[in-house]
Amino acid sequence: MLRTTRGPGLGPPLLQAALGLGRAGWHWPAGRAASGGRGRAWLQPTGRETGVQVYNSLTGRKEPLIVAHAEAASWYSCGPTVYDHAHLGHACSYVRFDIIRRILTKVFGCSIVMVMGITDVDDKIIKRANEMNISPASLASLYEEDFKQDMAALKVLPPTVYLRVTENIPQIISFIEGIIARGNAYSTAKGNVYFDLKSRGDKYGKLVGVVPGPVGEPADSDKRHASDFALWKAAKPQEVFWASPWGPGRPGWHIECSAIASMVFGSQLDIHSGGIDLAFPHHENEIAQCEVFHQCEQWGNYFLHSGHLHAKGKEEKMSKSLKNYITIKDFLKTFSPDVFRFFCLRSSYRSAIDYSDSAMLQAQQLLLGLGSFLEDARAYMKGQLACGSVREAMLWERLSSTKRAVKAALADDFDTPRVVDAILGLAHHGNGQLRASLKEPEGPRSPAVFGAIISYFEQFFETVGISLANQQYVSGDGSEATLHGVVDELVRFRQKVRQFALAMPEATGDARRQQLLERQPLLEACDTLRRGLTAHGINIKDRSSTTSTWELLDQRTKDQKSAG
C-alpha cells in the first residue's frame, strides 16, 4: 500500500510569487458593487477589463469579464479522472474551452495561467485497477498519458501546469485541517471527515441553489446529516491509502480541486471551468470549501460551464456510464481534429450539441469549401484563374464589416456561431466574384483584396486552432514543402503537354484531323495522370486550356473520387 507522512501546510502558492496572483492586490470595489442572479449576490471584481461579456453561472447572466491582475488571468480547469480512454463528450468540453482560452489570449490580449487537476486516485480507478489486476498508480499513469496524447491530437493547448492529486496529499490534508479548525467539518470514529453543510446556513448554494439530499446513503453512514459530503475517506481493505490525523485513507473528490486550485492561486480565482454536469455538486462544494478555508465572501469570480454532447436523437449525454460514447482515438480514424473543432465552433459553448456522422460531414464539407475558396483566391492572385471584373470596393467593405462582426461576436460570450456565419458570408461573396469566365476582365485585376481576405481567414482560424492549410496540403514532419514543390512541377509539365495537345493546328482538312488524332494520346495521358494522382489524394483542376491548379483531398473525398 502507498503511505506518506503528513507534510507542511499549504505554504506559499506555487506560482503566486512569480505571477503576482492570489489574494494580494485584489480588493472589493468601492461600495461593493453587486449584481444578483437567481437570488444570489455577486461581487464584481476590479482589475483589468477584458472587453468581453461572459455568461457567469454564478449569476445566470452575462457579466463583464474583469480579471484581477493585468499581467495574467487565473484559470482552474477540472481535469480527468484517469481510469479509461477519453471520449468525445470530454473532447467537446476541452476543445470548447481551448477555443475560449485562445480567443482571450490572441484577440483580447489576456495572458492566462491555467491549472488542471488530475484525479489519479478514485473509486473508479481502484475498481478498474482491480479488474485489470494492476496497481491503481499504474492504471492512472497509463490513462493520464493517454489523455494527454488525445488532447495533443485535438490540438488542445496544455495547461500551464498539471497537478496530480496523489502528489499533493499533504496540502490536501492541511486544507481539510483548516476547514475543521473553522468549525465547518468534523471527523468520525471510523476515520472519515465530512463537511458540515448545515454550518454554512444559507451561504451554501451560490451556484445552483440546490442542497443535496439523502439519496443513496448507506444505512451505516457515520455522517451527522445525510447531506454532508466527504473530505477524507477512511481506507477500506486492499485500497490505496495515505496516513492522516484521522487514520489511513484518501481524499474526497471535491476537496482535491479546492486544495490544488488554492495551492496555486490562493484565495482568489478569476475563472473556473468544466462541463455543466460538474456544476452540482462538484463546483458547488468547491465554493463552500474554499470560502470557508479562505474566510472570503467570493472565491471564484466566474464559473463557465460547457453543454453536454449528445448522441443524435438521444436525451442523455455521451458518457462511459451509459456506454454510448465514441473514444477520441476512434473518432480521429475518420475525421480530422480540425473538423471536430469546426463542429464545436458552430454551436455556443454553453449549449448541448448533437453528435452524428451527418453533422460531422457537414462541418467537414464547410471546412473543405473554405479551403477550396482560398485555393481559388490564390489561383486568381497568381493569374491562373480567369474571371470577370471583380467588385473590389464591395469586397473591401465586406472584409471590414466581417472583421467588426467577428470581434463583436467574440466579445459577446464567445458567440462562435455568429462568427462562423460571418466568415462563411464573406467566403460566399468572395466566391461570387471568382466565377470563371472565358472573357477577358473589363477592368484591372484586383488581387490585393483577395490577399487580404486570405490573410484574415488564416489569422482567424489559426487563432481558434484550425489550420486551413491542412485542407489543401499535408501536415506532418515538414515534408509538405517538398511534396508541394514536386507536385507543382508535375502539374506544370502536364499543363504544358495539355496546352500543346489542345492548341488548334494550322493545317486544314485531312492534315488537321491527322494532327488532332496524333495529339489525342497526349490528352488521354494527361487524364490518366490526373486519375492516378486522384487515387493518391491529389486533385488537379483544369481551369482553362492553359492553366491548372491542384489540391490535396481528405481521405473520404479521395475515396469518393477514386470510386467514381
UniProtKB/Swiss-Prot annotation:
Its cofactor is Zn(2+). Keywords: Aminoacyl-tRNA synthetase, ATP-binding, Disease variant, Ligase, Metal-binding, Mitochondrion, Nucleotide-binding, Primary mitochondrial disease, Protein biosynthesis, Transit peptide, Zinc. A motif ('KIIK' region) lies at residues 124-127. A motif ('KMSKS' region) lies at residues 317-321. Zn(2+) binds at residues 78, 257, 282, 286. Belongs to the class-I aminoacyl-tRNA synthetase family. PANTHER family: CYSTEINE--TRNA LIGASE, MITOCHONDRIAL-RELATED (PTHR10890:SF27), CYSTEINYL-TRNA SYNTHETASE (PTHR10890). 'KIIK' region and 'KMSKS' region are required for cysteine persulfide synthase activity. This is Probable cysteine--tRNA ligase, mitochondrial. The gene is CARS2.
